[in-house]
Regions:
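Alpha-helix capping and helix-coil boundary motifs
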Residues: 16, 41-45, 99
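Short secondary-structure transition/capping segments
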Residues: 45-47, 131-132
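Switch II (G3) loop of P-loop NTPases
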Residues: 37-43, 51-74
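Charged, low-complexity, helix/coiled-coil-prone segments
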Residues: 24, 47-57, 103-108, 173
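A general structural motif
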Residues: 5, 54-56, 86, 117
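C-terminal accessory "lid"/substrate-recognition subdomains
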Residues: 2, 23-42, 55-59, 122, ...
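Conserved catalytic-core segment of NTP-binding enzymes
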Residues: 62-163
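Walker A (P-loop) phosphate-binding motif
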Residues: 1-26
Length: 173
C-alpha cells in the first residue's frame, strides 16, 4: 500500500476515550477526526479517504487494535490493517494497562503487523521515567490526570508534545 504520513492514528487497549483523543489533539494542535468505529462496514474505503485529507489529522480508533475487522477485509484485526496501510500510530495506555502487561502485549501486536508505532503514552497514574526505561517499551511520555502535581504535569506534557512533533516530522505537522 502507501505510506500514510499525513496523519496519526491513536489506539488504546479496549479503544480510545474521546476525552483523551481531544486532549492529545489540543496538545498537538491537530484536527481531531470522529472516532473510527471498529464495526466499520467498509474500513478500507474509510482508510483510503484518510489518505486524501490534508495533513495534520488525528484519527482515534474506537476499538482495541486487536479487534476483528469486517469479514469483507482480508486483514484479521485492526493492527494488521493499520500496518498494511502504513498508518503512523500512537498507543495510549493507562497505569493499569502498564502494570497488567496489556501495554507490552499491544506494542508486540503492533510491531508484529509492522505498524509504524511512534511510541507509547501513559495516561494518568504516577509517572516514573526511570522505571519506564527499564520496561523496554518505546515510551514517549505521560499525560497526567487531575491528581498530579500541576507543575510536573505541565513539564511532562511539554516534553511529550516536543517528542511527538519530532517523531511526526515536518510532513506530519
Amino acid at each position: 500500500m502507501t505510506s500514510a504520513a499525513a496523519g496519526l492514528f491513536l489506539v488504546a487497549p479496549a479503544g480510545l476515550s474521546p476525552l483523551l483523543a481531544a486532549r492529545l489533539g489540543a496538545l498537538l494542535q491537530r484536527r481531531l477526526l470522529d472516532p473510527l468505529p471498529g464495526s466499520a462496514q467498509a474500513p478500507e474505503q474509510q482508510l483510503q479517504q484518510l489518505l486524501d485529507l490534508p495533513g495534520g489529522w488525528l484519527q482515534p480508533l474506537a476499538v482495541d487494535p486487536a479487534s476483528d475487522v469486517s469479514e469483507r477485509v482480508p486483514a484479521s484485526c485492526w493492527a494488521e490493517l493499520l500496518g498494511a496501510w502504513r498508518f503512523r500510530t500512537c498507543l495510549l495506555v493507562s497505569e493499569e494497562d502498564r502494570r497488567s502487561g496489556r501495554a507490552r502485549s499491544q506494542v508486540v501486536l503492533l510491531q508484529h503487523y509492522k505498524v509504524p508505532l511512534l511510541g507509547v503514552v501513559q495516561c494518568g497514574g504516577p509517572w516514573q521515567p526511570h522505571a519506564r526505561r527499564r520496561d523496554g517499551l518505546p515510551w514517549l511520555g505521560w499525560l497526567a490526570d487531575d491528581q498530579a502535581d500541576p507543575v510536573e504535569a505541565l513539564e511532562e506534557e511539554q516534553e511529550l508534545q516536543r517528542l511527538l512533533r519530532l517523531r511526526l516530522g515536518p510532513a506530519g505537522l
